[in-house]
């Protein structure tokens, strides 16, 4: 019995946690609540993959990076909601999707340097994390192209390097 959790409850509880974590945040360029982004990413993940861990991670993919929720708090909550192995699998995906090379963590690096290091790091994450990241990039690209065409050029160049790094790593391994 691999999937004991009620699938109807599973993403709903995670979505509620994401809503709580992102409360008060707005999407850049719009008045939409920020949580609409991870919800859309999760919806696309669910449409493409039959993997509820990926759906949960997609809902939570920006929680550690963009909210006050700590790794420990997320781990505790996941363990309250799911069996230990499922909680850890979701947490691992969220950690893989969380930017390491941020301005806060690496203030001495410029944006281009940080994005290159982040792309190189993301090239080595799990296949599931890569699949979520690609959908995240797709959704962000749509928004940026529509709302800030001048920044879109920079954003898309950074993502092109990331996609090349991911492809290169996958071809080597």
What residue spans do the PLM features occupy?
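Active-site helical microenvironments for divalent-metal-assisted chemistry
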Residues: 1-173
């Amino acid at each position: 019995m691999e999937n004991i959790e009620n699938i109807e409850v599973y993403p709903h509880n995670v979505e509620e946690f994401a809503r709580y974590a992102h409360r008060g945040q707005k999407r850049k360029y719009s008045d939409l609540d920020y949580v609409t982004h991870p919800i859309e990413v999760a919806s696309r993940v669910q449409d493409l993959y039959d993997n509820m861990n990926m759906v949960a991670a997609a809902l939570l993919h920006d929680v550690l990076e963009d909210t006050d929720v700590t790794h420990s708090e997320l781990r505790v909550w996941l363990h309250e909601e799911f069996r230990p192995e499922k909680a850890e699998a979701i947490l691992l995906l969220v950690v893989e999707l969380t930017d390491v090379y941020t301005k806060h963590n690496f203030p001495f690096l410029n944006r281009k340097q940080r994005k290159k290091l982040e792309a190189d790091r993301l090239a080595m994450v799990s296949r599931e994390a890569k699949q979520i990241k690609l959908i995240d990039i797709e959704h962000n690209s749509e928004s940026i192209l529509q709302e800030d065409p001048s920044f879109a050029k920079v954003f898309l160049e950074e993502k092109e390097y990331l996609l090349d790094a991911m492809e290169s790593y996958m071809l080597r391994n």
